[in-house]
């Protein structure tokens, strides 16, 4: 990892965004690692650093506006929007039953290319739901950018459907960096690598 990403990896760890221990996942599996990037919003300097790390990835991508996915990525997308002066929208998790009954909040025009911003990629399921809402509104999606790719199949499943997943960091990047620099005990790293390998 370069200096900027090493600093980001350290700050994510110290902010409690990534924890090691024993955690029950939604699927019922017991995981030795837990990634909760919602903590980022409580650390303004970290939020700014996270937004900067996305900026470096998205400068070469073609898009008209960004779409933050609810809920964790909306503040991240807002920070990116402010830093890069990109117009932003977001697809709602649930359709509004009153007022405009909108599926998508913010201004947009059919035919525009939208860059999806999310916090984490696991299998890609939630990305496909968002893509469906955006494309149903006449928007074009080519690229999805996340902070961390858990490397659990999202890149492959999105790729097969014709979408490009870009990640600031992969789980392998983080584990290798923390192991090499003695930030996390070796046995915890090994246990986590084994778990991630087996749960793919």
Where are each of the predicted segments found?
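Active-site-facing substrate-recognition patch
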Residues: 1-58
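PRPP-dependent phosphoribosyltransferase catalytic core
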Residues: 2-12, 132-200
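Conserved hydrophobic/aromatic pocket- or pore-lining residues that grip, position, or stack substrates
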Residues: 28, 66, 88
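Phosphate/pyrophosphate-binding loops at sites that engage ATP/ADP/AMP, CoA/4′-phosphopantetheine
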Residues: 54-64, 131-137
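Short glycine-rich phosphate-binding loop at a beta-alpha junction
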Residues: 62-72, 145
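Conserved acidic residues
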Residues: 64, 112, 142
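Short, glycine/charge-rich flexible loops or terminal/linker lids adjacent to PRPP-binding catalytic cores
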Residues: 76-115, 123-128
């Amino acid at each position: 990892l370069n200096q900027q990403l090493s600093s980001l990896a350290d700050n994510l760890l110290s902010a409690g965004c990534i924890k090691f221990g024993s955690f029950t996942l939604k699927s019922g599996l017991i995981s030795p690692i837990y990634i909760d990037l919602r903590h980022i919003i409580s650390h303004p300097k970290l939020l700014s650093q996270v937004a900067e790390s996305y900026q470096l990835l998205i400068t070469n991508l073609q898009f008209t506006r960004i779409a933050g996915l609810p809920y964790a990525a909306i503040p991240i997308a807002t920070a990116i929007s402010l830093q890069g002066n990109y117009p932003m929208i977001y697809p709602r998790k649930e359709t509004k039953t009153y007022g405009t009954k909108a599926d998508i909040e913010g201004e947009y025009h059919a035919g525009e290319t939208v860059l999806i911003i999310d916090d984490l990629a696991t299998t890609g399921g939630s990305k496909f739901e968002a893509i469906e809402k955006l494309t149903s509104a006449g928007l074009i999606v080519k690229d999805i950018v996340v902070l961390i790719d858990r490397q659990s199949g999202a890149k492959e499943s999105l790729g097969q459907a014709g979408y490009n997943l870009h990640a600031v960091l992969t789980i392998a990047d983080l584990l290798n960096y923390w192991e090499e620099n003695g930030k996390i005990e070796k046995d915890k790293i090994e246990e986590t690598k084994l778990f991630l390998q087996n749960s793919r």
